[in-house]
Every structure is written in structure tokens, then in C-alpha cells.
Amino acid sequence: MTERLPPELQTELVKLQQLQEQLNRVIAERSVIDSQLREVNKVLDELKQLPSDTIIYKIVGNLLVKVNKDNVEKELDDQKTILELRSRTYQNQETKLRTQLEEKQKKVNEMLSKYYPQRGAGAKA
């Protein structure tokens, strides 16, 4: 028994799959951003424990460059702000996509029950 799905249902299933893939991409991107944010926070915590006259080196390309602790903290604070903003943006996208996904899933389920009502629901064997 190989029934073909109605075109409308096929279209909705494709849209559902696209939403799921989009949600997965957003979740993965947010995970990367959150990981970077945790790393920046760790480095900032470590820097705050060091005396202000501590010599700090930063990797720039293939070089280690001596840098001022205050400059590094400022740079990391700026990076932290940007990462937090990006994380919130991804979180908002994720929430929106989850809502759209739930609505699309509900629509697909309604279409499935319309096109394929349960057979033998009232029949007894």
C-alpha cells in the first residue's frame, strides 16, 4: 500500500522540515556563541585576579605580543558585550522558530487527520 501524499501536505511537510533545519542551525550557532562567551568570562575572571603590573602576552597571528592589562580587559569587555547581544539575538530567533515549528506541526497533524482519518475507529473485530 503506497499512497501518495497530497501536494498540500507534501508542501507543509517540506516547510516543517525547513523550519526544523533552521532551528537546528540557530541552536548550533547559539551554542558556539555561548561557548565563546564562557571563555571570555573565564579570561576576564583570571585577569581580574592579577595585579595591574602583570605582563600579559596576546597571540596575534603567529606572534606573541606584550599588551597592557587594561587594554586587554577593555577589549574582552567589548567582545563580551557583542557576544551577549548575539546570544540574545539567537535566543529570540530560537523562541520564534520554536513557536513557528509548533504551529506548523499542529497544521500538519490536522492535515494528516483530515486526509487519513483513523480507519475502523468505530468498528469492532
From Swiss-Prot:
The species this protein was found in: Sulfolobus acidocaldarius (strain ATCC 33909 / DSM 639 / JCM 8929 / NBRC 15157 / NCIMB 11770)
HAMAP family: PfdB (MF_00307)
Protein name: Prefoldin subunit beta
UniProt-listed Gene3D superfamilies: 1.10.287.370
Family (UniProt): Belongs to the prefoldin subunit beta family.
Single GO biological process annotation from the record: protein folding
Subcellular location: Cytoplasm
UniProt-listed Pfam families: Prefoldin_2
Physiological role: Molecular chaperone capable of stabilizing a range of proteins. Seems to fulfill an ATP-independent, HSP70-like function in archaeal de novo protein folding.
Quaternary structure, from the entry: Heterohexamer of two alpha and four beta subunits.
Keyword Lyase: no
